[in-house]
From Swiss-Prot:
Localization of this protein: Cell inner membrane
Membrane topology of the entry: Multi-pass membrane protein
Stretches assigned to the Cytoplasmic side: 1-7, 89-112, 171-227
Top-level taxon of origin: Bacteria
Keyword Transmembrane among record annotations: yes
Transmembrane regions: 8-28, 68-88, 113-133, 150-170
Alphabetical list of InterPro entries matching this protein: DctQ (IPR055348), TRAP_DctQ (IPR007387)
PANTHER family on file: 2,3-DIKETO-L-GULONATE TRAP TRANSPORTER SMALL PERMEASE PROTEIN YIAM
Organism: Rhodobacter capsulatus
Assembly description: The complex comprises the extracytoplasmic solute receptor protein DctP, and the two transmembrane proteins DctQ and DctM.
Family: Belongs to the TRAP transporter small permease family.
Keyword Cell inner membrane among record annotations: yes
Disruption phenotype: Deletion mutant is unable to transport succinate, and does not grow on D-malate, L-malate, succinate or fumarate as the sole carbon source under aerobic conditions in the dark.
Protein name per Swiss-Prot or TrEMBL: C4-dicarboxylate TRAP transporter small permease protein DctQ
Originating gene: dctQ
Amino acid sequence: MLRILDRAEEVLIAALIATATVLIFVSVTHRFTLGFVADFVGFFRGHGMTGAAAAAKSLYTTLRGINLVWAQELCIILFVWMAKFGAAYGVRTGIHVGIDVLINRLDAPKRRFFILLGLGAGALFTGIIATLGANFVLHMYHASSTSPDLELPMWLVYLAIPMGSSLMCFRFLQVAFGFARTGELPHHDHGHVDGVDTENEGIDAEGDVLLHSPLTPRDLVEKPKDN
């Protein structure tokens, strides 16, 4: 079940990024092409090239008739959703930046306590945001307000807040449970690309994958002793 949730989370984030990227590319290309064609119209007219000027003007009229004003608004909405679900993904994979200078100076029991305290605080905060966000979405639903360009229901736009925060709260609890059980935190290596040079990397003598974080030195993880 968790694998399905993880996969759905990744697919959603990838789809949001891809859609926003394509929209921005098309919008910028359209804007600059419109300017270039307008310059060509003036150039052809200045050199007495009537036929070319007429063709360029016709192309300019066609391009100007393509309305992409809504693209900016949609991109903003996509980035809002991307940020909320991306934050939850960051908790699950350990991408978020953490300041661990003081934590690493503590002994193992205190380090463990403060890590769990931090994860619990993150779950509490995001849970509060999810609750407040749900109330706000309900208020926007009854207000029946819409966005300026796309005229989308604003409650649908703001739905990213309770949904993303709820998922982030769940991820904090998931990481806290995993840490309490195994003493390990998810850790993302920024110099590592999935599927590239992964052979024999992060694998111990028994073939188990290690996900140790700077917050979880190996002295926190007690490996079973062979009888």
